[in-house]
Amino acid sequence: MSSFGTLFKVTTYGESHCKSVGCIVEGCPPGMNLTESDVQVQLTRRRPGQSNLTTPRNEKDKVQIQSGTEFGVTLGTPIGMLVLNQDQKPHDYSDMDNYPRPSHADYTYLEKYGVKASSGGGRSSARETIGRVAAGAIAEKYLLEAYGVEIVAFVSSVGKIAIPLHETASSAILDPEDDTFESPITAEYLKFLNKITREEVDKTTVRCPHAATAAKMAERITRARDNHDSIGGTVTCVIRNVPTGLGEPCFDKLEAKLAHAMMSIPATKSFEIGSGREGCKVAGSKHNDLFYRNADTGKLGTLTNNSGGVQGGISNGENVYFTIGFKSPATIGVEQSTSRYDGSDGVLAAKGRHDPCVVPRAIPIVEAMAALVVMDAVMIQQSRIASRNLLPNAQ
């Protein structure tokens, strides 16, 4: 389906080479200041052609708010936004029209719908994510103003190159006779997640906040591009100042909704929250997040955060953080011996303009989907609280 969310609902539309792409946002609270410039910031971070590490497709991606606001204020009615496609080159795909691109969605879309877009990948193109980013910018603005929620994503690895702070401690066994490991999430890493900013992330073209590692990542992406190949990587995201109580057990737990959102992004292959897979190697005595009373807030907090800010599917007030794995882009210029749609053998060397690595441009998409999840969860929880407060003898 092309819609996401329950109370804060987003529907995206458009294909890679159609006239426009965009979205309709339902459920935005009325009375919030909102202009196109509020949305444009994130769309500009997502747009192609920002560096030689991304596709050279030249799109301005200027957003137009079509409805739902008046005099720069939200009305509480559906907000329609569109972005014009202006640099399509369908002829780049003419030679590929006889082939389903290996590991791309060409074949599966044809099998599902009985017809496929002849150029650009149609709905499976990353152009579809423009609507997500636009909607996410609205959600993020509300969350920041109402709750102080901050969302920052960054590239944590490209291929085998990872930032040092993202390396885990699980490679060192504590005792030769003990087969358990230390917690993979160090205090240093948690401090890093607590202070990292988008300005620091955007200082490098790769969007990795560790300069030395970013340079190596850039070299790796450049090598893939020069070889007409591609490479994958990971994006880590932290959500700060998350209210407690978000998430709907049992099937709409907060981490389940985040996983749903992140795995709906094109090219994603994995999702890990908190200590992730590495936490499976740790004994409970080393992995449990012990509670303490926060002197500033008077509330309980945790000394560590292996849970990633979620326990029992509900936010506990700590930072929510997770890592998403993105595969290498499927459309590459390397010659591949594969079959045509008619079953005959051939050699495909893809043409067109494509990202050699998607993770640098995936940053605002990940942030947007995180904002949509938290926004929807906040509205659901607030409706529960409001209903409860109407009871005269609520306990």
Swiss-Prot record:
EC class name: lyase
GO molecular function list: chorismate synthase activity; FMN binding
Matches recorded under SUPFAM superfamilies: Chorismate synthase, AroC
Cofactor(s), names only, from the UniProt record: FMNH2
Catalytic activity line of the entry: 5-O-(1-carboxyvinyl)-3-phosphoshikimate = chorismate + phosphate
Gene3D superfamilies documented for this protein: Chorismate synthase AroC
A single BP term in Gene Ontology: amino acid biosynthetic process
Source species, domain of life: Eukaryota
Keyword annotations from UniProtKB, A to Z: Amino-acid biosynthesis, Aromatic amino acid biosynthesis, Lyase
Record's GO cellular component terms: cytosol; nucleus
This protein's pathway: Metabolic intermediate biosynthesis; chorismate biosynthesis; chorismate from D-erythrose 4-phosphate and phosphoenolpyruvate: step 7/7
Listed EC numbers: 4.2.3.5
One family name in Pfam for this protein: Chorismate_synt
Assembly and binders: Homotetramer.
Cited PANTHER family: CHORISMATE SYNTHASE
Family: Belongs to the chorismate synthase family.
Name of this protein: Chorismate synthase
